[in-house]
A protein has these predicted regions:
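Conserved small/polar residues in nucleotide/adenosyl-binding loops
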Residues: 230-235
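Small-residue-enriched hydrophobic alpha-helices in membranes
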Residues: 1-229
Length: 235
């Protein structure tokens, strides 16, 4: 069953708690547990559902960060997920509810951070989607930068990693050295090792095993393709 069937069909068979559970509960009729600060359930199903609702919520609030939600930002979000046509209205309902205000995004981010390791490839992929939404209408605004920095901090990424993402999406998305976190004078063998490491870190099988839904893995592979193609643009 697709992730959408698990979420909107009410067949997941578990209680989804916390802020994300509250968001899902606005229409799904699930029982919602009071959120506590203990470690959340670690089953893959729970991670997938939390991750998917978290994507919708954070993407909507990302788009709202500068006060204006553009059609480019909505399109960028839709490009990041495989959404069944019959579930599109449900997804839009969560999106529209979350985008009413930028406030509260930290609670969604913290709940996701409890499910995955700090600086994990899954959280990194989510950050990539948020960056792609931010830049989709031409530039990353000051408000969007502040939003992204706060989410990045909650997810456990250091300042160096955040600055790298800013550099990639603002200026050098096609620069192989920036993407591979290398310098032009680095030995080619060293650069190739970094490429292989990044590809292994973001391999679809690895991401799915950690709890990332297939519907996200299959669509949100722009970064992986970018890393793969760097060998074509290196001297």
């Amino acid at each position: 069953m697709s992730i959408w069937g698990k979420i909107f069909g009410g067949t997941s068979g578990f209680v989804l708690g916390g802020p994300l559970g509250g968001l899902l509960g606005i229409f799904a009729g699930h029982a919602i547990d009071k959120f506590n600060r203990k470690k959340l359930p670690e089953s893959i199903a729970v991670k997938q559902v939390n991750f998917t609702i978290g994507i919708i919520a954070l993407s909507a609030k990302m788009a709202k960060a500068d006060g204006i939600v553009s059609h480019q930002e909505l399109d960028a979000f839709k490009k990041g997920l495989i959404i069944n046509q019959n579930e599109l209205k449900n997804v839009e309902k969560v999106w529209n509810f979350a985008k009413q205000s930028v406030h509260g995004f930290e609670s969604y981010a913290r709940q996701l951070a409890k499910l995955f390791k700090p600086n994990s490839s899954i959280l990194e992929n989510l950050i990539h989607l948020l960056f792609s939404i931010a830049i989709s209408d031409g530039k990353i605004t000051v408000e969007e930068t502040e939003f992204l920095k706060k989410v990045s901090d909650i997810f456990g990424f250091d300042k160096k990693k955040f600055n790298l993402l800013i550099e990639i999406y603002s200026n050098n998305e096609n620069d192989p050295y920036t993407i591979l976190q290398s310098n032009i004078n680095d030995p080619i063998d060293q650069i190739n090792k970094k490429r292989i490491t990044l590809l292994k870190r973001h391999h679809p099988d690895v991401l799915i095993a950690k709890g990332q839904p297939l519907e996200f893995v299959e669509k949100n592979n722009h970064y992986v393709k970018t890393v793969s193609y760097t060998h074509l643009t290196l001297p």
